């Protein structure tokens, strides 16, 4: 609901359940807190997985209040406080690294963060032209079980050409995760999912622990990485068919990598 109680507030609640995962999400946003341009919001979520693309179960509970303040027509600043509790349980055939992380039990992370967004894209004929830049960091260590820093950067550009019939886009993303106390877990580290890097199965890129070098049988744990970068290039074009068919074509090229682990052993590959 984008106009909750007729006051311009946004309220969202979603439920997703399946054979191997469960997700509950609740969010609220007040765009005119104290009758000024300061926005106040809150996110609350619970996510469980039951051996989803892995040999163990996970639970993730998150509570995040935040404020958003405009910095002109194109830029805005978001500041948030996050409390996240994660748990790994019910392991099957897993390696030493995941076993150690399961034995840690429930871990609570308490952090404060910011995200700075500058969006110069112009809405034109239903498309967007221009440039988008996002920079964000999360500083963990406010009473939780670990202390560290997570940095994310994204830059995107879109451009229409040939009488606005062809759209070119480029997106580059990067992330760095560092800890000064405690260690990262598989629930913290980066994975290049299909919305970041197309063409690979879940967990198909980056460090993994295998009981044999071919990763064919036995242990085969996707561990994720503490660093990642990816570049996505895409062009969309019409097929020359009538518009009412709603069909268009596209080509894309993605290149990226996820790497780096603070804890490795002889069975870890691609770190």
Please annotate each region the language model reported.
Residues 1-132, 198-199, 205-211:
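Gram-negative/organellar outer-membrane beta-barrel architecture
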């Amino acid at each position: 609901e984008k106009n909750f109680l007729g006051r311009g507030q946004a309220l969202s609640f979603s439920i997703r359940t399946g054979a191997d995962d469960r997700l509950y999400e609740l969010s609220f946003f007040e765009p005119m807190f104290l009758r000024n341009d300061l926005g106040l919001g809150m996110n609350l979520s619970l996510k469980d997985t039951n051996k989803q693309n892995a040999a163990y179960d996970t639970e993730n509970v998150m509570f995040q209040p935040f404020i958003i303040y405009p910095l002109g027509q194109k830029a805005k600043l978001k500041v948030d406080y996050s409390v996240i509790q994660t748990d790994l349980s019910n392991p099957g055939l897993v390696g030493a690294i995941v076993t150690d992380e399961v034995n840690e039990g429930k871990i609570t992370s308490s952090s404060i963060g910011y995200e700075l967004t500058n969006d110069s894209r112009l809405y034109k004929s239903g498309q967007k032209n221009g440039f988008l830049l996002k920079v964000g960091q999360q500083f963990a260590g406010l009473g939780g079980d670990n202390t560290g820093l997570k940095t994310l950067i994204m830059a995107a550009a879109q451009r229409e050409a040939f009488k606005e019939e062809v759209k070119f886009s480029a997106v580059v993303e990067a992330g760095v995760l560092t800890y000064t106390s405690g260690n990262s877990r598989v629930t913290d580290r980066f994975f290049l999912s299909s919305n970041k890097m197309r063409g690979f199965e879940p967990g198909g890129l980056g460090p993994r622990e295998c009981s044999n070098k071919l990763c064919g049988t036995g242990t085969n744990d996707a561990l994720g990485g503490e660093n990642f970068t990816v570049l996505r290039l895409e062009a969309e074009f019409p097929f020359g068919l009538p518009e009412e068919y709603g069909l268009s074509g596209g080509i894309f090229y993605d290149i990226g990598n996820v790497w780096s682990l603070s804890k490795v052993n002889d069975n870890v590959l691609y770190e």
